[in-house]
A protein has these predicted regions:
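Non-heme iron-sulfur electron-transfer modules
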Residues: 6-41, 55-85, 390-393
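Short, charged/polar micro-motifs that form catalytic or ligand-binding hotspots
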Residues: 38, 43, 58, 170-174, ...
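Iron-sulfur cluster-binding electron-transfer modules in prokaryotic oxidoreductases
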Residues: 63-393
């Protein structure tokens, strides 16, 4: 093959080494037991499909490597070969509801910074001792902000919906509520009518990446009536995590291809910066920025690139006077729960190294990413302070 994908991650070098060392020097010569080495190293970033492989549809070979790997993960999960650790780490609602509480969150956060505890966690649970883990909040975003105030004089754009409903996401709800609170400030500042869902569950991306498709279906069906109501009423549905947006815009409609409600929901899902830029084109976005941001090294997450909407975040940040944005369009290497695991931590840091170097070379005042987890990972790699894009606005 062309091997254009070899530099993207460690799955492809593993695959090509197995092929080159086989008796036939083709895939048919690789021991099928070794297939799992490739499957486990794929974290479903979709970059090979989007940017490298020349054989994707409509080519007659119809190569879709990410979804092929996902099927492998689904087989492994169905056979009961997935680890307890992976099942627990992908249960983001359970983890959040258990740990994002007063006192408990403080104990967990303190423990996660304790070397003795992290050594124990590494040796028993295989969560790498050197991985910086996100803190859990003492309160949830939804619990504090569910009763959002109504807008007295809401705007009426013509190109995008005038009303917004926020899909909170597990990370914003349990780990960094400040991201959601900053976005609410933006909505209020710009007189955008908005609501929070009365209830929601995880989008299902962590379970999808594990191959637990039954759990993905259960989560999707719980979210369906909630999101369908707002989609049918013409709301823009906005998620503050690119992976969650991608799940609803791409993966769920593919999994449930006959469900028209999921297709309608996908049509109403917006990236936050894409939505705000649309308002700006109608001169409905406040540009009353009080501070310049100087130089920003901005990392474009894989799951945002896959959405093919362009560099909306960069465009919007550059509306701020005195702000220059340098984009980094490479995988950061963290990739959900994958980079947390002991066996993949070194690969995670290796994949991220070009991103770390590129971020530093710009001599930035800020290092930023739409993906909060990627942002933390890059900060760990370059040891710089970082702020999320939403905070900047």
């Amino acid at each position: 093959g062309c091997r254009r994908c070899v530099s993207l991650c460690t799955a492809f070098p593993t695959l090509f080494d197995l092929v080159d060392e086989s008796s036939t020097m083709e895939v048919d010569g690789v021991d099928k037991k070794d297939y799992w080495k490739v499957v486990d190293k794929c974290y479903l970033c979709d970059m090979c499909y989007l940017s490298k492989c020349p054989y994707v549809p409509p080519h007659e070979w119809n190569v879709d490597f990410p979804h092929l790997m996902m099927r492998g993960k689904a087989i492994k999960f169905k056979k009961g070969e997935s680890k307890v650790r992976d099942k627990l780490l992908s249960s983001t609602d359970f983890m959040g509801k258990t740990l994002a509480k007063p006192v408990i969150s403080n104990v967990v956060n303190t423990s996660n910074k304790n070397k003795i505890f992290r050594n124990l966690l590494d040796s028993t649970f295989k969560v790498h001792q050197h991985r910086d883990l996100p803190d859990y909040s003492a309160y949830t975003f939804r619990g504090k902000n569910i009763n959002t105030k109504s807008i007295t004089d809401p705007i009426s754009p013509s190109t995008v919906p005038s009303k917004v409903v926020l899909f909170t996401t597990c990370y914003v709800n349990y780990n960094e509520p400040i991201i959601g609170e900053d976005f609410l400030k933006i909505l209020n500042k710009n007189n955008i009518q908005h609501e929070l869902l009365n209830s929601e569950v995880c989008c299902g991306m962590p379970k999808f990446e594990l191959g637990d498709l039954e759990s993905v279906e259960k989560l999707a069906m719980k979210n369906l009536p909630l999101l369908s109501k707002y989609a049918n009423e013409g709301y823009a549905i906005i998620s503050l995590v690119p992976s969650c947006t991608l799940m609803f815009k791409q993966e769920i409609p593919l999994l449930f291809a006959d469900n028209q409600e999921f297709k309608k929901i996908a049509q109403q899902f917006y990236d936050p910066f894409s939505y705000l830029l649309a308002l700006n084109k109608e001169s409905l976005l406040s540009l009353d920025f009080k501070n310049d941001l100087g130089n920003i090294s901005y990392h474009v997450p894989c799951h945002l690139r896959v959405q093919n909407i362009g560099l909306k975040t960069k465009e919007l940040l550059e509306l701020i006077p005195g702000t220059t944005v340098k984009t980094i369009e490479r995988c950061s290497g963290h990739d959900g729960t994958w980079g947390i695991k002991t066996e993949f931590f070194k690969d995670s840091m290796k994949i991220g190294k070009p991103v770390f170097k590129a971020a530093e070379q710009f001599n930035p005042d800020y290092i930023s990413s739409d993906c909060a987890i990627a942002s933390r990972h890059i900060v760990q790699g370059v040891r710089e302070n970082s702020k999320k894009n939403i905070e900047k606005l």
